[in-house]
Amino acid sequence: MIYAVGIGPGDPDMLPHKTVLLLKEADVISGFETVLNLAEKHFNPNATRVSMGYKDQSEKLEQVGKYSREGKVCVVCFMGDVNFSGYEYLERIHNDCHEPDPIIIPGISSAQMAASKTLTAFETSEFLTFHKRGDISKDKEFLVSALKLGKAAIVIPLPWDFMPAEISRYLIEQGIPPKTEVNVFEHLTWPEEKSYSRT
């Protein structure tokens, strides 16, 4: 059995209770090393840790799939919430682990934290993530359209190609007024959290 869990934006005390219980009992815990480091205080000390990077993630997820077929409880950790910008990684669980039905446990996304800090309601705004592979031109157009309609936008940038400075330049080029208010957050819930309010 494979669980896909969101471990939140960074603060290990913001994990859902169910996720904490699962991490304490899991036989195998896997994910990118930076993500694992954030939640490791909740790990079963006897669990097998399968750390991966971008270059070896297929190989490491194949290992996780093998453990799962042996009857071990496996947890794959996602940054933030699986449903906000994790579906490409989830596809790898389907393909590389050969697991058609991983159990998804949501986490808290940095987008939710940003919305809380700016009192921005999701029902009256647009959420958009550029943090994915492939062409983002349609997403960029959608962002412009939403802002021209007067909506607020909650945006996750694309490291390091389409970050806040590039997003701002693009929006101005597309006719969004330079005086539009922008709030930028870095490392939300981390000790080194930073925020900027600009136009």
Each language-model region and where it sits:
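Solvent-exposed alpha-helices and their adjacent loops that cap or buttress functional pockets
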Residues: 21-22, 97, 118-121, 144-150, ...
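Short amphipathic alpha-helix with an adjacent loop that forms part of the alpha/beta core around
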Residues: 61-67, 139-148
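Short, glycine-/small-residue-rich phosphate/pyrophosphate-handling segment
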Residues: 115-143
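A contiguous loop/helix-start segment that scaffolds small-molecule binding in enzyme catalytic cores
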Residues: 2-4, 72-74, 82, 147-199
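Short gly/pro/ser/thr-enriched loop/turn and capping motifs at secondary-structure boundaries
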Residues: 36-38, 57, 109-113, 133-136, ...
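Short hydrophobic/aromatic-enriched beta-strand-loop microsegments
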Residues: 47-54, 101-103, 122-129, 177-182
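Class I S-adenosyl-L-methionine
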Residues: 1-105, 113, 153
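Glycine-rich, charge-decorated loop segments at or immediately adjacent to ligand/cofactor-binding or catalytic sites
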Residues: 111-120, 191-197
